[in-house]
Structures are given as C-alpha cells and as structure tokens.
Design a protein with these regions (language model features):
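Single conserved hydrophobic/aromatic residue that forms the stacking wall/gate
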Residues: 1-6, 10-11
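N-terminal-biased segments
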Residues: 7-8, 40-44
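Surface segments flanking catalytic/ligand-binding clefts of nucleic-acid enzymes
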Residues: 12-14, 55, 98-103
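Short hydrophobic-acidic sequence motifs that mark active-site Asp/Glu residues
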Residues: 16-18
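Nucleic-acid nuclease catalytic cores
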Residues: 20, 26-39, 46-78, 100
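A general structural detector for well-ordered alpha-helical segments in enzyme core domains, enriched
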Residues: 44-47, 85
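Domain-level recognition of nuclease-like catalytic cores that cleave nucleotide substrates
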Residues: 65-119
Length: 119
C-alpha cells in the first residue's frame, strides 16, 4: 500500500505504478537495477508506454533499502535491452523515480528521493 499524499503522483490522476526492488550495489555510492537480464521488466516498460497512449500517467518506482546511497542507475552492462527501453519510455513520458527506504519490523518507509543517473 502506497500513501501518495503530497507526492508527484496525484491520486486524482489515472496512475499506473510499477515498483521495482533494487538490491544491486557494485559501486559503494550507486544502487543499480536490474541485477540480471529481465525480459519481463522490458515487457513492463513497453506496456507502460502503451498505457501512456491510452491516457494513463505511468510511473516506475525504484525502491532500495541500501543505506547510505544517494544515486541510482540502470545497469546497462547487465541488460542493455532494458536500458534502451528505459530510455524510450522516459522519452515517451513515463516518469521514473528512485527512493531509499528504511526497513523495520513494522514497516518499509520511504526515507529519501535519490538521483537517477542516466549514462
């Protein structure tokens, strides 16, 4: 369940939100997605572009629980096809957001928006 109060994703809009869990950390300052080739992830990006054409506001949320990082990027060396489709989706108007989360026994709480690095 996501509470979207005061966020970039207004509840009144027709939003579609794809959530990706980010676990890859190769550089101590940058979280990355994907950690393996993801044909399914690429398919989802294409569906979000189609949803945009049908009047929806599509978002992809990259969420990580890796503490101390302030940056995120697509691991294009792992899945170049996903990276290319990410760029197409972004240019088409799909919105991409990345957040660092705090994890506890009771909840996962969004802590901070982090930068998305496009290489």
């Amino acid at each position: 369940l996501f509470r979207l109060v005061g966020s970039e994703m207004c509840i009144r809009d027709r939003n579609i939100i794809e959530v990706k869990n980010v676990t890859l950390l190769r550089d101590q300052k940058v979280a990355e997605f994907p950690d393996a080739v993801t044909e399914r992830g690429t398919k989802h990006l294409k569906k979000l572009i189609e949803a945009l054409k049908q009047g929806y506001k599509p978002f992809v949320l990259f969420l990580t629980q890796i503490q101390g990082i302030n940056n995120f990027k697509i691991a294009k060396d792992i899945d170049l096809n996903y990276y290319k489709n990410y760029l197409i989706a972004k240019k088409s108007g799909v919105k991409f957001l990345a957040y660092r989360c705090l994890l506890s026994n009771k909840e996962i709480k969004i802590e901070k928006k982090i930068n998305i690095i496009d290489e």
